[in-house]
Amino acid sequence: MEILKGRRVLRGKVIEEARRWASNLPFKSSVILIGSYARGDFNLWSDVDIVLIAELQENPLERLKSIDHPPGYEVIPLTPKEFLTLLRKRNPIAVEAMSNGIILRDDYNVKKLLKHEMKPP
């Protein structure tokens, strides 16, 4: 029982740290925690998977360089248009965001978009 409680506490701390990081971003963005910490099946070697939706530079390498994130974070930077395209194509990242994602910040109203775009055909 103590192990489960410890895992819940650790997960809660990671989510709050990610939420704090997201709230401190100096630009309009929506941030979704995905992956093992969102699902609750993380382990000692898990990273913190984040989908970052914002108006970003065109070059993917420049995007990554421009985002200051804590060690252990795996940030997937997308523009709103790119994210919408992934949703419509049922891309695994978008499906993960819809089914298990935890929205940490939502300047682009992604929550509404997720409900609308991910309805069954």
Regions found by a protein language model. Give the residues of each.
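A short, conserved beta-strand element in the Rossmann-like catalytic core
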Residues: 51
